[in-house]
């Protein structure tokens, strides 16, 4: 499981470019580096579980988090490709979008809600994604005692 993070929140118009790049480097390139390091080992042993840490900010957006949201959606793109490249070697790659109070997010949630967002509520989803029965290419949102699948969909489209 790769999980490293920093925040440099500001609206896009006010965000220094350096803050944008720094956050993308930590979240997206850090995740890619972790996966790149273990993937060859997993390929040789024909088994592996990679869990990418994404975020609801990447999946749905959040004001003032263009850098963070872009990086976390980039992690989903990385997962979508690794699930294909690893499938024939029994390497399953999934993403988790946790919602929990941490030192980094402590100020974002009201005090009366923080108990519900204890990181312990993320653990069952992580254990499942690390197990032999893990799916391949799933995005799970986890927090407050709820685990939900999240999907990127394409409709039938309209012909013109």
Indicate where each model-derived feature is located.
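A short helix-coil junction within the Rossmann-fold of NAD(P)-dependent oxidoreductases
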Residues: 37-46
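Residue(s) in the substrate-gating loop at a strand-loop-helix junction
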Residues: 55
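Active-site-adjacent segment of SDR/Rossmann-fold oxidoreductases
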Residues: 42, 60, 76, 81-91, ...
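C-terminal helical subdomain
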Residues: 95, 113-160
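The catalytic Tyr-X3-Lys active-site helix of short-chain dehydrogenase/reductase
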Residues: 25, 58-61, 66-74
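Substrate-binding pocket helix/loop in short-chain dehydrogenase/reductase
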Residues: 11-12, 19-21
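A short, exposed helix-loop element centered on a Lys and neighboring polar residues
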Residues: 35-36, 80
């Amino acid at each position: 499981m790769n999980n490293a993070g920093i925040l440099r929140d500001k609206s896009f118009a006010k965000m220094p470019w350096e803050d944008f790049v720094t956050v993308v480097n930590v979240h997206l390139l850090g995740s890619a580096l972790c996966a790149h390091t273990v993937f060859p080992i997993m390929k040789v042993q024909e088994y592996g579980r990679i869990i990418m840490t994404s975020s609801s900010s990447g999946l749905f957006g959040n004001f003032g988090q263009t850098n963070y949201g872009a990086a976390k959606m980039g992690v989903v793109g990385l997962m979508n490709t690794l699930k294909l490249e690893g499938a024939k070697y029994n390497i399953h790659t999934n993403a988790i979008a946790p919602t929990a109070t941490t030192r980094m997010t402590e100020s974002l949630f009201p005090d009366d809600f923080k108990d519900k967002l204890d990181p312990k509520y993320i653990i069952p989803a992580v254990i499942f994604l690390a197990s032999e029965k893990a799916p391949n290419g799933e995005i799970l949102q986890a927090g407050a005692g709820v685990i939900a699948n999240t999907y990127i969909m394409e409709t039938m489209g309209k012909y013109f």
